[in-house]
Regions:
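Gly/Ser-rich helix-loop-strand patches that form or flank binding pockets
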Residues: 106-147
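A short acidic, glycine-rich active-site loop
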Residues: 56-70
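Short alpha-helical
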Residues: 15, 96, 122
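General small-molecule cofactor/ligand-binding pocket signal
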Residues: 37-39, 87-91, 144
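Small/aliphatic-rich secondary-structure junction motif
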Residues: 2-55, 82
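Structural beta-alpha unit
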Residues: 2, 77-113
Length: 147
């Protein structure tokens, strides 16, 4: 079995993404130099025509980061318990969430992307969420989708 030392986990706070983080950490632990990067993409839903000040955007981003810290602490504990280095990054307002994940993986020479099967969108009947499907389609490295 291939050893994946550089693992990227895409997190949105959903249960599948938290499970994906745990599995990504365990997989990375099997390598000699485990390194997991957890990314959370903050995508605001501000309509383009809305006039928003930079301070309003900063406030929204800070709130999103504070909310994410609640579930990121669980991921940090899992990494610490497994002796795996964890780096947490936030990507703010990309044109595409899928492109942000795929580009990050490519730019940082990631060995494996681990992502939850469905996010927080609420489409529970879908077998695979649109973000997971997009990452599977466009990533140049292996992708593990966790249910």
């Amino acid at each position: 079995m291939a050893k994946f030392s550089k693992v990227l986990v895409a997190l949105d706070g959903s249960q599948p993404s938290i499970k994906a983080a745990g599995l990504g950490i365990v997989i990375a632990k099997r390598s000699n130099n485990p390194q997991v990067t957890a990314i959370h993409v903050i995508h605001s839903s501000i309509p383009i025509a809305t006039l928003v000040t930079p301070s309003t955007i900063d406030t929204m981003v800070n709130r999103a980061k504070q909310e994410a810290e609640k579930w990121l602490n669980e991921v940090r504990r899992t990494a610490d318990q497994n002796g795996v280095r964890l780096k947490i990054e936030f990507i703010v307002n990309p044109a595409s969430i899928v492109a942000a994940i795929v580009d990050h993986a490519q730019n940082h020479y990631i060995d494996l992307i681990v992502i939850g099967s469905r996010g927080l969108s609420g489409f529970k009947k879908l077998l695979l969420g649109s973000t997971a499907l997009g990452v599977l389609t466009y990533a140049s490295c292996p992708v593990l989708v966790v249910k």
